């Protein structure tokens, strides 16, 4: 999808990419996370889970079915080059990368998987520098939080909040957008506390 998106982009375009689904931590093979984080975050990439991906490493899926944050960043970097400095690139991620990806007794769904996708490391794996964030990222929660759905609506809180705000988000500043999203999140507050984040630049 992102490859097709890039092919249709031109200078000055406004590009909006929205991922709503489950996320999972997977082994960081190129070492870029160690330059960004310390502790447990330094060994794992965040990934999006397509419908045909497996939850654990196996002959049918050695990680190639997952969409790691490194791969996402490379595609976004290519789109940024196509649209240039006058274009706008906005990425919304309605997922988290931990949790149980199930509905509990209170019908509250978490959009993450608590099992890490562990890929056997090869010795001497080179380190790579993280790609600079040249786009605006709207995240459903902070890295240590869980992302949940709006109870009774079967839709992620971030997706619902962005739908509520509509096209007005395009011209909002980062701080205003964060505040407006947080206000909507509070309307649907539940036992799972999550704080929306806006990082990077358009």
Question: Residue spans of the language-model regions?
Answer:
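A short beta-strand-to-alpha-helix junction
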Residues: 63-70, 136, 144-160
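Extracellular S/T/G-rich loop segment that most often corresponds to the catalytic His/Ser-adjacent loop
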Residues: 89, 95-152
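Short, low-complexity, polar/charged sequence segments that are solvent-exposed and flexible
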Residues: 36, 110-112, 155-160
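Caspase-like (clan CD) cysteine peptidase catalytic core
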Residues: 1-20, 24-106, 172-180
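Cell-envelope and extracellular/periplasmic
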Residues: 20, 51-55, 141-143, 147-148, ...
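Short, solvent-exposed loop/turn segments at the edges of secondary structure
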Residues: 43, 131-133, 157
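Caspase-like cysteine protease fold
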Residues: 129, 142, 161, 165-202
């Amino acid at each position: 999808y992102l490859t097709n998106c890039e092919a249709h982009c031109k200078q000055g375009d406004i590009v909006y990419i929205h991922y709503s689904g489950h996320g999972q931590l997977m082994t960081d093979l190129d070492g870029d996370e160690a330059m960004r984080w310390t502790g447990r975050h330094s060994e794992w990439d965040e990934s999006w889970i397509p419908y045909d991906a497996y939850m654990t490493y196996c002959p049918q899926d050695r990680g190639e079915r997952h969409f790691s944050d490194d791969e996402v960043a490379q595609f976004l970097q290519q789109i940024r080059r196509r649209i240039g400095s006058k274009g706008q690139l906005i990425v919304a991620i309605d997922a988290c990368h931990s949790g149980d990806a199930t509905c509990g007794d209170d019908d509250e769904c978490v959009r993450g998987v608590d099992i890490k996708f562990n890929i056997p490391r090869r010795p001497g794996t080179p380190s790579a520098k993280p790609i600079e964030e040249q786009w605006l990222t709207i995240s459903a929660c902070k890295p240590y939080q869980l992302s949940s759905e709006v109870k009774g609506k079967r839709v992620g809180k971030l997706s619902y909040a962005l739908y509520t705000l509509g096209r007005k988000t395009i011209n909002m500043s980062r701080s205003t957008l964060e505040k407006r999203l947080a206000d909507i999140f509070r309307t649907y507050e539940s036992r799972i506390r999550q704080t929306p984040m806006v990082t990077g630049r358009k």
